[in-house]
Every structure is written in structure tokens, then in C-alpha cells.
Curated annotation (Swiss-Prot):
NCBIfam families tied to this protein: phr2 (TIGR00591)
Other remarks in the entry: Over-expression of PHR decreases growth inhibition, leaf necrosis and CPDs accumulation under UV-B treatment.
Region (Disordered): 1-33, 487-506
Record GO terms (molecular function): deoxyribodipyrimidine photo-lyase activity; DNA binding; FAD binding
Keyword presence, Signal: no
Source organism of the structure: Oryza sativa subsp. japonica (Rice)
The protein's name: Deoxyribodipyrimidine photo-lyase
């Protein structure tokens, strides 16, 4: 892991460095050293796209330099990891992969899909006689454990195969941005800003590689696969206010009809924290989570239009780069990113000091999930997440803090917030989601505030404060309309085993 936050100078691809990616974006996990000329396999994990993908670019560069063919592989994670993914997330994932597979075929790029889990990757590598396996990066435990298992298998059974990991998700690679877990956005922002110009560069074209002449991928019956996987998953209805895939992601960013940067960026700075104005938000988080669009592409395009709305673009870049990549920093350096033990010591102490404080209201997880509390604003935020698949960012803070206030202790509060977030949010099971819950409940990336019952020194939020910031009644009415439309539509479509939520609320 690089010990400093400043990366080495950028070098152009060449015999000594055939990769188009910045050298510090790549980690050599296992050097290998055998099978020269064997295919290069890109194991796609988090970054499910062909365009603007540093991991794919790195793999293609290696293949081109050795006149070797290139293949892409994706393995669906088995249970228990997928137990926390419901029909909502799995449907989006698979429909995106279906589009990706078609795009890969159009480029004559073999795409291997496995349903038996990451354990199938080493077997593919051995069958193909691959020289190098390239994986993209995720800081989450299940993905890191899967990568460790694959590397361990290859070290035992095919030690000549090199294994590289490329951070294709962050503008500044997580291990380069900082060598430690950062305390706050301020400290992280300072480090990232120093090297931003070195990494925020335009993507090159994908290097040309020799035609594929090895084992062909098995055909996939996508309709059957989607139906089977979704039928086995918990029935949280899919959404359709955003379509999966790279083309839809670019349309959401730059579309002439309703693109964020082309049509809506101007109001971002002033309206993004108003839950009654959801169109002020980018709507890009599902695409960023599933890797259908590169954050670097979003940042590059935002910089191009900064002269039109500098304050809004700067605010967007703060969220897109600093805050989002700070979440990866936390999850990378703190393995207990979803536990009270992952909080700073001051936060753990103050929460435990007040864990036995009397609560005015105590709700069960079932009551919270069904939005059965005394607070109509909180109920609305929960219903927005259930029916829309995305809760407004400002409301997520209020929502999580009230869970701390209304459950028996901080551990229960955090586990409940993460459970509900991962179940209903289309971008659940994401570093930003874990950090959002940790910020609200455990004071992560925040400071201590005036001590009070239950919260201790954790920042407090209440109904009156929300009422001063936005039209609470308008938000509640908006969500009621959403929920009513969704329930009606689901009732009409209930014979269909794969139910979707409408785009009418977007």
C-alpha cells in the first residue's frame, strides 16, 4: 500500500508500463511471472461498465502489450452476501449486466457470467491459461474476502498467474488519497485536492487487442435468470424511475431532455437540501453504486460546465468526490464499518454513557419498517424509501437520528438503520450508506456537540429544525402521493412476478 498521499508522476503506456492507468491506481497483489502470452481476464466486480473503466483499460493495455486476447468475467455473489440484496437491487444489477453483455458482444469482447459465485473465477483462469487476472476495487468485506479467496486459490493452483487490482471507482485511488482512516471531510479534502489534477484526466481509448480464440462463454437466458434470481429474493419491488445500464447513466448526466448537468445543475447549490425539491438532486447514485457510470466522467463533465454555475458545480464535486470517496476511505481502513466498534472512541463512550437513558418512545424494527411511529415526517421519509427506492439525502440524516432516539440502544439503532437502508435503497450495501448511518448515529466525520439525553454528544436533529428548513407538510403530502400511486400500481401488476415501481414520481 503506498505510504504517501502523493502519487508518482504519470507515465505514458509503453514497454515498461503498458497500462494506460496511472501507476498508483494499480496494486500488484500477486506478481505471478509465468504463462507469457496467455489471455488477460478482467474480473468485473463493482464497476459494471465498459466505458471509462480504468480496470478494463489496464487489462486491455496488458493484453495489447503481450499480443494476448482479453476476456471479461462477472460472478454473482452467493448467499449470505446476497441475502441483503432484494429483488429491487438484484433486478437492477441483472438488467444492467444484460445490457453490458450485449455491448461486449458488439465489441467482440467475451463476457463470462457465473452464477456459482467468485469461486468459479480461478477455474476459468486456469482453463483459459490466463497470464493475468485484473480485478476492480471495493472496500466492503464480502468483496475483499472473495478476492482474498481467489488469490489464495491461484497462489496454490496456478502461481504463475499475476493478480492486479485497479481502483476504477474513485477519482483518486483510495490507497493513494490517504494512508490512514481520515477523521473528517476537511482533512481528506486537503489531501485529495493536492493530487486531483494528476488523476482527474480524460480517459484514453480502449487499446486494441487480438481477437478472442479461446473457450467461448455459455449463452445466458437472461429472462430466465432474472426471473429465477428475483423469485428467490425477498420481494421488495423494483423501481423504474431510472433504467440500468451505461446508456441510461449517461442520459441521466448529460441528456438533452432531463440531464442533470444539462438541465438541472443550476438549482443544486440552493435546493439540494430541500426534500420538497427532489429534482435538484443528480439522481446518479444508482449508476455510481452499480458502476454504470464513472465518477471521474461525472467530474470531468461537471468541470466543463462550471462557468455556467460555479457554486452548484463546486457543491456537486464536493459530494461526488470528497464525500463519496471519504466513505471508501473509512470502509477501507475500518473493517468494522457497520458496527459501533468502528466509531471513534469519543463517540462510543458518549453513546454508551447514555445507552440506558429513558426514551420517550420505543419502537420495534417492524414498527419502524412499516412507518408506524408518532412522527408523520419520519413516517414519510421511511415510506419514500420503501416506495421510491431512494430517500432524500437530508431526510436520511433525520431518519437515522430518530432511530437512535427511538430504539433501546445505539447498537440496535445502527443495525436497524443499516438493515432498512440496505433492504429498500436502490443503492444499499454501499460505503456511502454505511457512512451515512455511522455519521448520523455514531458521529463519524463529525464533532462532539452539546451533551443531551440519549444522544450524548452526537449531533441532534428534531422536527422543529426541519420545519424551519423546508415545507414539512408539502414533503409529507408528496410522499403520500408517491405511496398511493405505488400501491395502486403494485396491486394492478401483482400477477407479474417481477414488479416495478413507476417513474411518475421522479
Amino acid at each position: 500500500m503506498p505510504p504517501t498521499s502523493v502519487s508518482p508522476p504519470r507515465t505514458a503506456p509503453g514497454p515498461a508500463n503498458p497500462s494506460p492507468a496511472h501507476p498508483s491506481r494499480v496494486r500488484v497483489i500477486h506478481p505471478g511471472g509465468g504463462k507469457p502470452g496467455g489471455p488477460v481476464v478482467y474480473w468485473m466486480l463493482r464497476d459494471q461498465r465498459l466505458a471509462d473503466n480504468w480496470a478494463l483499460l489496464h487489462a486491455a493495455g496488458l493484453a495489447a502489450a503481450s499480443a494476448s486476447p482479453l476476456a471479461v468475467a462477472f460472478a454473482l455473489f452467493p448467499r449470505p452476501f446476497l441475502l441483503s440484496a432484494r429483488r429491487r437491487q438484484l433486478g437492477f444489477l441483472l438488467r444492467g449486466l444484460r445490457r453490458l453483455a450485449a455491448d461486449a458482444a458488439a465489441r467482440h469482447l467475451p463476457f463470462f457470467l457465473f452464477t456459482g459465485g467468485p469461486a468459479e473465477i480461478p477455474a476459468l483462469v486456469r482453463r483459459l491459461g490466463a497470464s493475468t487476472l485484473v480485478a476492480d476495487f471495493s472496500p466492503l468485506r464480502p468483496v475483499r474476502e472473495a478476492l482474498d479467496a481467489v488469490v489464495g486459490d491461484l497462489r496454490r493452483e496456478a502461481p504463475g498467474v499475476a493478480v492486479h487490482q485497479v481502483d476504477a471507482h474513485n477519482v483518486v485511488p483510495v490507497w493513494t488519497a490517504s494512508a490512514k482512516m481520515e477523521y473528517s471531510a476537511k482533512t481528506f479534502r486537503g489531501k485529495v485536492s493536492k493530487v486531483m489534477d494528476e488523476y482527474l484526466v480524460e480517459f484514453p481509448e480502449l487499446p486494441a487487442v487480438v481477437p478472442w480464440d479461446r473457450e467461448q462463454p455459455e449463452g445466458v437466458d437472461w429472462d430466465a435468470l432474472i426471473a429465477r434470481v428475483c423469485s428467490e429474493a425477498e420481494n421488495v419491488p423494483e423501481i423504474d424511475w431510472c433504467e440500468p445500464g451505461e446508456e441510461a447513466a449517461i442520459e441521466a448526466l448529460l441528456g438533452s431532455k432531463d440531464g442533470f448537468l444539462t438541465k438541472r445543475i443550476k438549482s443544486y447549490e440552493t435546493d439540494r437540501n430541500d426534500p420538497t425539491k427532489p429534482r435538484a438532486l443528480s439522481g446518479l447514485s444508482p449508476y455510481l453504486h452499480f458502476g454504470h457510470i464513472s465518477a471521474q466522467r461525472c467530474a470531468l463533465e461537471a468541470k466543463k460546465c462550471r462557468h455556467l454555475s460555479p457554486k452548484s458545480v463546486d457543491a456537486f464535486l464536493e459530494e461526488l468526490v470528497v464525500r463519496r470517496e471519504l466513505a471508501d476511505n473509512f470502509c477501507y481502513y475500518q473493517p468494522q464499518y457497520d458496527s459501533l466498534s468502528g466509531a471513534w472512541e469519543w463517540a462510543r463512550k458518549t453513546l454508551m454513557d447514555h445507552a440506558a437513558d429513558k426514551r420517550e418512545h420505543i419502537y420495534t424494527r417492524e414498527q419502524l419498517e412499516n412507518a408506524k411511529t408518532h412522527d408523520p415526517l419520519w413516517n414519510a421519509s421511511q415510506l419514500e424509501m420503501v416506495h421510491h427506492g431512494k430517500m432524500h439525502g437530508f431526510m436520511r440524516m433525520y431518519w437515522a437520528k430518530k432511530i437512535l432516539e427511538w430504539t433501546s440502544g445505539p447498537e440496535e439503532a445502527l443495525s436497524t438503520a443499516i438493515y432498512l437502508n440496505d433492504k429498500y435503497e436502490i443503492d444499499g450495501r454501499d460505503p456511502s450508506g454505511y457512512v451515512g448511518c455511522m455519521w448520523s448515529i455514531c458521529g463519524l466525520h463529525d464533532q462532539g456537540w452539546k451533551e443531551r439525553p440519549v444522544f450524548g454528544k452526537i449531533r441532534y436533529m428534531n422536527y422543529a429544525g426541519c420545519k424551519r428548513k423546508f415545507d414539512v407538510d408539502a414533503y409529507i403530502s408528496y410522499v403520500k402521493r408517491l405511496a398511493g400511486q405505488s400501491k395502486k400500481r403494485n396491486a394492478e401488476e401483482s400477477p407479474n412476478p417481477v414488479v416495478k415501481l413507476s417513474k411518475s414520481q421522479h
